[in-house]
């Protein structure tokens, strides 16, 4: 688990982190939040619809790390060698039957149908973790799977941003005097790589002392038109504030929300707030917080 911590921007040594979490849990009258994760909809079959997360981690996790980190991914195949923190071997016998499945993830995504994972999903896809510094839960994608995306209303874009709207993916590059947008259709993306030859490229020019508003949707009145019936007439918009020098991605037209939502890949640690909605692996989740 030590190699996971830097990916989550956690600087506390692993054993010290566990000790500090246990102190919070065991302290009399200690107040901390619990996170309930609800499966709203999915093409996969889950054993239950609500999962509870505490500062220790996912309740009833087979990994049982109690480190405040919940790793999301697929179940790994059996391993013959032992490894600390992710395999349990009965020390009283060397019987191979005592070697349990190699479980590296806490939240296990069901495999569709009867297909075998063939070792393709050995690494966690993303994580939810408890931050000891501000006592909040955060989510971070590891960029190893399909990806975790959060539903946004108004989002500050800094650097490059990957957006999903309807059946399209938008890669947004923020440069000094312009915003470059590469639009990939999902049907093309499934069979090809993110190459310029496979996308439609749009550009927004930025003027230092002038605000700008760019609408994106299927309406012919939008500044950037994408022909996709899954999109609203105005699906989202990009706003530039010349005073703050900030660039915002807004769902809908900035006032009225879109029908299917605007989604951003969670490439940076993001705080989970009440009613936080995200999707991953054909599953839509909503997070709710409650005080202990």
Please provide the spans of the model-predicted regions.
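Intrinsically disordered, low-complexity acidic Ser/Thr-rich regulatory segments
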Residues: 1-124, 129-134, 150-226, 287-292
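Short acidic-glycine-tyrosine-enriched beta hairpin
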Residues: 154-162, 268-277
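C-terminal interaction modules of eukaryotic adaptor/scaffold proteins
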Residues: 274-292
